[in-house]
A protein has these predicted regions:
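Amphipathic alpha-helical dimerization/coiled-coil segments
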Residues: 14, 92-112
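Short, structured secondary-structure boundary patches
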Residues: 2-4, 12-13, 46-49, 62, ...
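N-terminal helix-turn-helix DNA-binding core of bacterial DNA-binding proteins
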Residues: 15-54
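Canonical helix-turn-helix DNA-binding module
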Residues: 41-83
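Short, cationic-aromatic polyanion-contact patches
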Residues: 21-26, 43, 76-99
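Juxtamembrane helix-loop transition sites at the ends of transmembrane segments
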Residues: 43, 54, 90, 105-107
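N-terminal leader segment of winged-helix/HTH proteins
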Residues: 1-21, 68-70, 85-87
Length: 112
């Protein structure tokens, strides 16, 4: 995919994601990373490190994705600040990622 062409259409893609999937771009990135890591359980801090976004809060996105039933979240028994994501539904995640790529491909093919 041509990066410059993608960037030129980034706002259109963001609007389409919100309209069709009710998700933000960051939520798609989080799902892509969860799918890539393929772990049954992951600490939210570890996920942030893998995303390379230590200074960006992702709690709103985590809550939204959890509300959609893509995974469950729970607090650590000994340290309430730690949040674990578990029971990750990889089949739903893969389906959403596939829809994302379809949306992007459709937008980029219409613009060319």
């Amino acid at each position: 995919m041509d990066t410059i062409y993608y960037e030129e259409n980034r706002n259109t893609i963001k609007r389409a994601l919100k309209k069709n999937l009710d998700m933000s771009f960051l939520e798609i990135v989080i799902l892509e990373k969860l799918n890539y890591l393929n772990k049954e359980k992951i600490d939210a801090v570890e996920l942030k490190k893998h995303l390379n976004i230590e200074n960006t809060p992702i709690s709103v996105q985590i809550n939204h994705l959890s509300d959609l039933g893509l995974f469950k979240k729970s607090r650590d028994v000994y340290d309430e600040r730690r949040i674990f994501l578990h029971d990750i539904d990889f089949s739903k995640i893969k389906s959403i990622i596939k829809q994302y790529h379809l949306i992007v491909d459709t937008i980029l093919s219409r613009k060319s």
